[in-house]
Amino acid sequence: MLQSLAGSSCVRLVERHRSAWCFGFLVLGYLLYLVFGAVVFSSVELPYEDLLRQELRKLKRRFLEEHECLSEPQLEQFLGRVLEASNYGVSVLSNASGNWNWDFTSALFFASTVLSTTGYGHTVPLSDGGKAFCIIYSVIGIPFTLLFLTAVVQRVTIHVTRRPVLYFHVRWGFSKQAVAIVHAVLLGVVTVSCFFFIPAAVFSVLEDDWNFLESFYFCFISLSTIGLGDYVPGEGYNQKFRELYKIGITCYLLLGLIAMLVVLETFCELHELKKFRKMFYVKKDKEEDQMHIIEHDQLSFSSITDQAAGVQEDQKQNEPFVSPQPPALADGASDH
């Protein structure tokens, strides 16, 4: 009997706090996913980093042996300066000195990566004025970009998602949920084809050192706004039509980001995903909210009445102990 009561109480407790339990499992799952990614990346990339370090040490040792007139501190000072310049997008290589990083098209590309929070990091402001302007420009521009993207996605979603689903539901009598699922899958396939596979094939042709996998990797890293910066198009030596190419890439990134947001919004509107998301939300208890509001109002009213009573008490304390008589009464007393 006691066990059944304890079991039923535990079940009621779990059901009552189901949203909190689901949220706790969500946080735990996210942390485990982060740890899983760190373990995989470390196990895969660390051996390649070690090989690269060993290769660089051998090259450095061989270079010093062949050039005995050059000391190791001098070489390290030179290499440090070269690496520092490379971090700012400036290279000392003879085949990489023809492209400017801050002409208009490159600056336009940089501004688009800043506002979209992609931020490849291949080009950064050099001057203090440029860094200060970048801060101010981002503080204003990023919320402006979010507002712009929200407005565009809302309008595009109406014409691309809601109206087609409603048309097939009303005109042909199909189930709205089934039509929404099929439409979301088809829209995802079209978006991946138009903004991932086809651009990856184009980049693999236009960029000499990129294969299809590297081009697809760039498309995904860019449109997901990760922006690692290890692959940046239009930075090759003697790139043909470089200005036009940079403008085209800027338009591609903006349109691709809008397309990605439309697809995400389409999937988020699916009934099944809405039910799944509600598992992790705090449930709104209207009666409990009303009780809190009433208690807050009562507390506010009682505090106001207490303040009014305090004011009246102060006024009474300031009054004299013997109240002055009215003038009429005083005159009558003198007549008598």
From Swiss-Prot:
Q: Where is this cross-link: Glycyl lysine isopeptide (Lys-Gly) (interchain with G-Cter in SUMO)?
A: K274
Which catalytic reaction applies to this protein? Answer: K(+)(in) = K(+)(out); NH4(+)(in) = NH4(+)(out); Na(+)(in) = Na(+)(out); Rb(+)(in) = Rb(+)(out)
Indicate the annotated site residue(s) for Part of a hydrophobic barrier that is stochastically dewetted and limits ion permeability: L146, L261
User: What ranges does the record give for the region Selectivity filter 1, renumbered to this chain?
Assistant: 117-122
Q: Output the Gene Ontology terms for molecular function.
A: identical protein binding; ligand-gated channel activity; potassium channel activity; potassium ion leak channel activity; protein heterodimerization activity; sodium channel activity
List GO BP terms, alphabetically.
chloride transmembrane transport; glutamate secretion; potassium ion transmembrane transport; regulation of resting membrane potential; sodium ion transmembrane transport
| Bilayer disposition of the protein | Multi-pass membrane protein
As for subcellular location, the record says: Cell membrane; Recycling endosome; Synaptic cell membrane; Cytoplasmic vesicle
PANTHER family in the cross-refs: POTASSIUM CHANNEL SUBFAMILY K MEMBER 1 (PTHR11003:SF59), POTASSIUM CHANNEL, SUBFAMILY K (PTHR11003)
According to the record's subunit comment, the protein's assembly and interactions are: Homodimer; disulfide-linked. Heterodimer with KCNK2; disulfide-linked. In astrocytes, forms mostly heterodimeric potassium channels with KCNK2, with only a minor proportion of functional channels containing homodimeric KCNK1. Interacts with KCNK3 and KCNK9, forming functional heterodimeric channels. Interacts with GNG4. Identified in a complex with PSD and ARF6; interacts only with PSD that is bound to ARF6. Interacts with UBE2I.
| Protein name from the UniProt record | Potassium channel subfamily K member 1
Native source organism of the sequence: Bos taurus
